[in-house]
């Protein structure tokens, strides 16, 4: 995952800074940013987050140049809320997306992948294979809770119906019994921790939150999970991606 934009002042991501006002929209350049190629891309996979909301509302992401759709990607239920959601957003003709806010809030987005267009060469690499949802790990069953500011490495490829040769997975990641507000980040084991978040805890102790994540697997088919406040982590797989040699 790599941060594409962040409206909070002082954050390293480029682009618009400052809260989005009620009914305000910003255009975010995608092609050539956050690991996305400059050509051959039709859509971006992005974890979109709203934070420090002034009032209940929602965020909607859509292709730049199109009309605002009757749809939402992230719903913010209370003032001060932080909430993420994974979205696949088509790009506009200029390679950008537009992010609209119904009420005042900061917004940020982390790229976790992209969808190629018809100009990409035909290949089995990157082919998605769906599976029936299955639990691949749960720290409540083994290992115990993650310590505050702690990281665990979990074998994902080769677990359950995910073959050892898979290069990426789609997970529903859940944090349970977080003792205080914070966030969880998942990334390929063996690579540097990214400036990104997978899900956020914001309300009360023992908060439970879940979010979808599309992730490459790292060393030995593992994915690392960092939890700022600590707590239990579990993940359910819903599919995987085929590598260059197929499976």
Predicted regions: what is each one?
Residues 1-247:
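Short edge beta-strands and adjacent beta->alpha junctions
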């Amino acid at each position: 995952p790599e941060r594409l934009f962040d409206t909070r002042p002082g954050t390293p991501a480029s682009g618009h800074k400052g809260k989005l006002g009620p009914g305000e929209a910003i255009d975010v350049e995608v092609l050539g940013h956050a690991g996305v190629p400059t050509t051959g891309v039709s859509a971006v996979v992005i974890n979109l987050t709203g934070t420090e909301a002034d009032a209940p509302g929602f965020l909607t992401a859509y292709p730049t140049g199109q009309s605002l759709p009757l749809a939402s990607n992230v719903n913010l239920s209370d003032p001060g809320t932080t909430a993420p959601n994974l979205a696949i957003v088509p790009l506009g003709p200029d390679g950008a997306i537009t992010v609209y806010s119904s009420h005042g809030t900061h917004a940020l987005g982390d790229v976790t992948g992209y969808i190629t267009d018809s100009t990409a060469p035909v290949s089995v690499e990157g082919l998605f294979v769906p599976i029936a949802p299955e639990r691949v790990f749960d720290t409540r069953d083994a290992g115990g809770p993650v310590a505050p500011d702690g990281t665990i490495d979990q074998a994902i490829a080769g677990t359950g119906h995910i073959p050892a040769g898979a290069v990426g997975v789609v997970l529903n990641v859940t944090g349970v019994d977080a003792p205080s507000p914070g966030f969880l980040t998942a990334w390929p084991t063996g690579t540097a921790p990214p400036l990104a978040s997978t899900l956020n805890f914001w309300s009360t102790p023992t908060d439970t939150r879940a979010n979808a994540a599309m992730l490459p697997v790292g060393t030995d088919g593992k994915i690392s999970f960092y939890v700022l406040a600590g707590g239990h982590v579990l993940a359910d797989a819903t599919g995987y991606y085929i590598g260059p040699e197929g499976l």
